[in-house]
Amino acid sequence: MRYNRFLVMKRFRLPGYLLLLFLLACISTLSARRPNAIIIFTDDQGTVDMNCYGAKDLVTPNMDGLAKRGVRFTQFYSAAPVCSPSRVGLMTGRTPQHGGLNGNVPLDSVGMPSQQITIAEKMKTAGYATAHIGKWHLGHHKETVPNAQGFDHSFGHLVGCIDNYSHFFYWSGPNKHDLWRNGKEVFHNGEFFPDLMVKEAGEFIDKNKDQPFFIYFALNTPHYPYQGSPKWLEYYRDLPYPRNLYAAFLSTTDDRIGALLSEIENAGLTNDTIIIFQSDHGASEEVRAHKGGGSAGPHRGAKFSLYEGGIRVPAIISWPGNLPQNEVRNQIATGCDWFPTIMELCKIPAAEHEIDGKSLLPVINSKSARSAHKIFHWKSGNSVAVREGKWKLVMSGKKAELFDLPNDLGESRNLVKEHPEMVEKLRGKSAVYWQSVGQSK
């Protein structure tokens, strides 16, 4: 009888034991879920145009909040000083030269070669739901649009810039409507484009909150036309023109970034989501941008320029509970580096093809880690630049300028005559690089 009772007890214990194993397996699976990743990419934002970068006349609490919850970079460079090639660096982890697109995509061009492998393609292959929301500017033919480049979902405009209410291409005529959702033209006349972006992102997050997702949230702001909210236009009314118009538009942008972050919080995904923030390049001084408004702070130059004001940009990464918070990194890093960094953080196998980016995880985790790059090259029109360590050489035709950046942030003292050996060294390395990519300087 006692033996039979023992058997009965074992029979009742066994299901409980199996249940425990099942629960432990479920917990392990949940804890092993890979993080979501969102890249917030602003357009034409100046080098220091955030409070945390030293701006005293701007209200940017949401951008600053990301810095408080993450790591902020002080020597972060875009891959190029203009829109399209900068985005090539971000999307492919390759320099614009290796990515096949040196300048902005003209209307009669296909765009970035379709054989380039984007971060979205890698994420999608790894089981991520992928979305492009906002500006594209890497091609508007069927083989180069977002849905053909790894994005499950796409909403936004394909060319360089639009009016934020009519959604018409804002450049040379004839102006054309440019708002698309997954290859189909859609119309939201009178609705503010950044608001549409937040709404689209919120719906995508809600739909995919139970699986890992990747969102490329590419704002068309504060790129002209400056269309700040009335409350911010009033708030900044006493700032000098055109800073007042730019500032209002930037704070309007900050509001929408805050709205996006609220969507993540409301979904309960704040601690499960990597947020990366970067401007595509420096602020614009074009006529349509009222010849300025943005600030490079102590730096020289602006959009299109290879001086620091054209290529040194604000950049932040935040992942609460997993990465350092409220810390600053002074190492050199570039927009090409987000590709391998995200791959490592999301535990996705590294790219099998050659990329130029380096994972920033060692730098993110330690202020004493070495810079990701010993040397980096840029090109804009007929000008090229190379930085190695503290030295930067800018060349245009026969003109050469050598700067000691840590001691000359404004690039005002040309040291060509004082350090001819460094000029020749960097000139030689530059020549080798441009020959390797099949381009002359």
Predicted regions and their residues:
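Bacterial N-terminal signal peptides
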Residues: 17-26
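Formylglycine-dependent sulfatase
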Residues: 10-15, 28-400, 405-441
